[in-house]
Design a protein with these regions (language model features):
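Bacterial N-terminal signal peptides that target proteins for export
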Residues: 1-10
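Surface-exposed acidic/polar loop and edge beta-strand patches at domain peripheries
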Residues: 22-203, 207, 211-224
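Bacterial N-terminal signal peptides
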Residues: 9-18
Length: 224
């Protein structure tokens, strides 16, 4: 059995030095973390949050979007929302048979996207955009929660993908998202974060496992 690992490491928001909004009147203003959380709640889309002890660092995750990090904040509910969200597409409430670009900040993806071992084209189809289709396993499937705490969550999912060479790959995914505290962020960055700087940081670890009977090789193809 072969295990494939993808460690995306630490993400510290590029807006680490941005000033946070304040005041009750700003709580649900567009562009804030609270606004985006409410946007999903109003549409019946389940979310879960990873939150620091002081409530300032927040990460919003959606199981139905493959355990995707949709957005984050360095200053709680009233802070800037750092993720890009495709409001218009989500508001339509319709699935696109080719690809559903809901947006987000960090997600699980799988390759190859092109070539004889691509998971995005059928055997015999010309590999052009019109024939490109994202597998449901990384587009519309809900990932299961294996474990969860206030600062981390672990998702799992098993599925089968058929390549452009008509070979079936049975894949298990374990995806962990973990909020990183100040000490952890400083260790990763190799630098001290000033006490007056608001920040949010998290790391993800994605492990793919061969659940089939045949080995994955360079010649026969393998997920990337």
């Amino acid at each position: 059995m072969l295990y494939g690992k993808m460690n995306l490491g630490l993400l510290v928001s590029a807006a680490i030095f941005s000033a946070a909004c304040s005041g009750g009147s700003k709580k649900t203003a567009m562009g804030t973390y609270a606004y985006d959380r409410a946007f999903f709640a109003e549409r019946g889309i389940e979310t879960l949050e990873l939150t620091s002890e002081d409530g300032a660092s927040r990460v919003l995750v959606i199981p139905a979007y493959q355990g995707r990090v949709m957005t984050s904040s360095a200053a709680g509910d009233t802070g800037d929302s750092y993720g890009w969200i495709n409001y218009k597409f989500i508001e339509k409430g319709e699935l696109n048979p080719q690809f559903n670009p809901v947006g987000g900040e960090e997600r699980f993806w799988i390759g190859p996207e092109g070539g004889p071992n691509s998971f995005y084209f059928k055997k015999g189809d010309e590999q052009v955009y019109a024939n490109w289709k994202v597998p449901a396993a990384i587009d519309t499937d809900t990932y299961d929660i294996r474990s969860q705490s206030g600062s981390s969550v672990c998702f799992t999912r098993e599925f089968a993908l058929r390549s452009a060479s008509d070979r079936v790959f049975r894949i298990g995914v374990e995806r962990t998202i973990e909020l990183v505290d100040r000490d952890g962020a400083e260790q990763t960055l190799g630098a001290e974060i000033p006490g007056d700087v608001k920040f949010v940081a998290y790391r993800t670890n994605n492990v793919i496992t061969n659940r089939g009977d045949e080995s994955w090789t360079r010649d026969s193809g393998m997920p990337s």
